[in-house]
A protein has these predicted regions:
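Tryptophan (W) side chains
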Residues: 2-4
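Secretory targeting and sorting signals
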Residues: 10-48
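Extracytoplasmic/periplasmic ligand-capture domains
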Residues: 20, 93, 118-152, 270, ...
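Extracytoplasmic
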Residues: 51, 83, 103, 111-113, ...
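N-terminal lobe/hinge region of extracytoplasmic solute-binding protein
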Residues: 57-111
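Surface-exposed binding/hinge segments that line
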Residues: 157-257
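Alpha-helix-centered segments that form part of catalytic cores
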Residues: 172-174, 251-286
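Long beta-strand-rich cores associated with HINT superfamily self-processing modules
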Residues: 612-637
Length: 637
């Protein structure tokens, strides 16, 4: 039966952070070229006699064991990390931040300056038996502190032309802008973070937890697990390099962190140091584009005890109907793919399966390129290139505006999203959901009116007039203004439909849209050869700054957008707790600039659909990423 949870009426001030980055790409590898995959290839069938294995359908494929690396910001990678690592807190399905006291504690120890002590419980260990200590809480200094990166000679993350030694998503995060000092506690089990000011979201601006001894070992060429005593010595080497800012040594660690975890398969040849974690499960194997198998970590003591599930198998089935058929056949236990109307209907007909519909905090959006992507060597010269003159910048803005005017958002919502969730609607705020009491007030003032007033036909006519100013021979019949749009895989039914609607809609405004799908598209977002993109983001945390840092200048700005007023508003939202009125004012400042610059448009919030066999207990998806996995330790048959 269908169960619809309610979207929170309070403002979801949510900018998800996996490690230190705000959002994770939804369905970024929603369909690899694996259309030949058949359900018979699925391992560990759900009907096996032993009921200690859970088999999950994934529409993504593993690309990295490090989701904080700049090209690895994918939901599947984050899901694996969620199962294999534990930190100081997590979100439940009620938007409540829960402290993980099995792992450690944190507390405010000073209001002025604002200091928080983060402390690991004694006896916590990594999967190789090495103690978890303060050393393992220091990596954020390299992966999320621009100040430390510059001081240690690891590169200036603000320089988008040169990739820093740690190619991380964390720069420009709250950790980067708010943490001013890190010190180690006398017992070497904790760190004290000093913040720029009292911070509303300090609980989400803590240290990452990473087995730093593995970086030191791999940098030295080691390819097997060491003893705890050996690894403690390696930790101390890391600490020395950190405290002395040993540039050469830290760069070696950065190379390992940035490159070695980019794996698509795991087998006997894989360096076991890459698989060390403190989570409930460890990656046992991974077959490229097919499946990832995780087994219990026998040394796990950093979180809630599991309830009987000893193995989790995540099978990549990129074809939606095939995944649903696998559930119907009893070959898998959990389906959490990208739903379609037909898929929703098919799920509802499967006996012995609980189908859950819920409002997620994942959403569909489209962005246009405003400038060079970080690390791009060649300048962006596409249709939206702003150039250096007032005339060229005006032309670029006109063409961007035309793109959004002609973008067939309403048709996409009606034909693709409403059949899945009746409440689906075009989303005109960049922060507040339609259910928020602030939504109407925001969209009346943020500059989005031009993209919803009149009919789509009248908006498209206005768009065509703008395009013809610069492409006088273009027409709806023979569009000549070329725009290259980045999106996902050809076997993703939803995206196929969207791409076709977008191409046809933009053609009416004189745009000749190239909507060729790209394998592993999320790794290409920063590339200057693409003029625009559309896709989905998943949100994993609730922060005061909301979704605003999608438009923050710097290395995390894939589309080359930069606006001083936007950056100032984001900075104001990143500090002390603000009143609702001040939060609204800063959100409005951001939205007016982004809409005024014709930089971005949200399409709709995703209706969530997932399903599980009714013998799997405690299956209760959360609106926040990682959705179905958030309480995996409670699962049992």
């Amino acid at each position: 039966m269908w169960e619809w949870s309610t979207f929170p009426q309070t403002v979801p001030r949510n900018q998800g952070e996996i490690m230190t980055k705000s959002r994770v790409l939804r369905g970024a590898i929603a369909a690899l070229a694996a259309t030949g995959l058949v359900t018979g290839a699925i391992m560990a069938p759900a009907k096996a006699a032993t009921r200690t294995t859970v088999v999950i359908v994934e529409s993504n494929a593993l690309t990295s064991l490090n989701p904080s690396q700049a090209d690895s910001n994918l939901v599947i990678n984050g899901d694996i990390a969620y199962l294999t690592s534990m930190g100081f807190n997590y979100y439940n399905d009620k938007f409540q931040l829960v402290r993980n006291t099995k792992f450690g504690t944190y507390k405010i120890i000073s209001q002025s300056p604002f200091k928080v002590e983060w402390h690991v419980n004694p006896g916590r260990v990594w999967s190789d038996g090495t103690p978890v200590t303060a050393h393992d809480l220091l990596l954020n200094q390299m992966t999320a502190s621009s100040a430390y990166s510059k001081a240690a000679g690891l590169g200036d993350p603000a320089n988008t032309d040169i990739t820093p030694a740690f190619n991380s998503l964390g720069y420009t995060s709250l950790y980067d802008t708010q943490v001013t000092n890190v010190s180690i506690t006398p017992d070497r089990l904790g760190v004290v973070l000093t913040y720029k000011s009292a911070n509303a979201d300090y609980e989400l601006i803590g240290p990452s937890v990473f087995p730093v001894h593995t970086l030191v070992a791999m940098a030295a060429g080691e390819k097997k697990l060491g003893t705890p005593a050996h690894n403690v010595a390696l930790k101390n080497k890391f600490l020395t390099a950190y405290t002395t800012k040993d540039t050469a040594t830290l760069k070696k660690y950065g190379k390992i962190w940035s490159e070695s975890y980019l794996v698509t398969s795991v087998d006997a040849k894989t360096n076991p140091l890459l698989l060390v974690g403190n989570g409930a499960y460890q990656v046992e194997s991974a077959v490229k584009d097919q499946r990832v198998t995780l087994v219990l970590n026998p040394r796990y003591n950093s979180g809630e005890p599991t309830s009987g599930i000893t193995k989790i198998v995540m099978n990549t089935i990129t074809d939606g109907p095939a995944g649903i058929q696998a559930l119907a056949n009893g070959e898998v236990d959990v389906w959490a793919g990208q739903a379609t109307a037909d898929g929703k209907a098919a799920l509802s007909k499967i006996a012995g399966v609980n189908v859950k519909g819920y409002a997620t905090l994942s959403y569909e959006h489209t962005d246009v390129r405003m400038g060079d992507g970080p690390g791009e060597k060649d300048k962006y010269t596409g249709i939206f290139a702003p150039g250096t003159t007032a005339a060229s910048q005006a032309q670029a803005k006109d063409l961007r505006t035309a793109y959004f005017l002609a973008f067939p958002r309403d048709e996409i919502v009606e034909k693709v999203w409403k059949p899945i969730g009746d409440a689906s609607a075009a989303w005109d705020s960049l922060n507040y959901p339609p259910s928020s009491p602030n939504y109407a007030k925001m969209i009346a003032a943020n500059g989005s009116a031009m993209y919803r007033e009149g009919t789509q036909a009248s908006r498209t006519a206005a768009a065509l007039a703008l395009v013809k100013k610069y492409y006088p021979t273009t027409s709806a019949d023979k569009p000549t203004a070329k725009v290259r749009i980045l999106w996902g895989q050809p076997s993703n039914t939803r995206r196929i439909s969207e791409a076709a609607i977008i191409k046809a809609g933009l053609a009416k405004a004189g745009f000749d849209a190239d909507v060729t799908p790209v394998s592993g598209w999320s790794a290409h977002i920063s590339e200057n050869k693409y003029d625009a993109m559309f896709g989905g983001y998943g949100i994993s945390a609730v922060l005061q700054k909301g979704l605003t840092d999608n438009w923050q200048s710097g290395i995390g700005q894939d589309m080359g957008y930069s606006n001083d007023k936007v950056d100032a508003a984001i900075l104001a939202l990143s500090g002390a707790k603000l009143s609702d009125d001040k939060v609204f004012a800063n959100y409005l400042a951001v939205e007016k600039e982004v809409y005024g610059d014709a930089a971005s448009m949200n399409i709709t919030m995703w209706p969530g659909v997932s399903a599980a066999v009714n013998t799997l207990q405690n299956f209760k998806p959360s609106p926040l990423t990682p959705e179905v996995l958030w309480n995996f330790w409670e699962w049992k048959f």
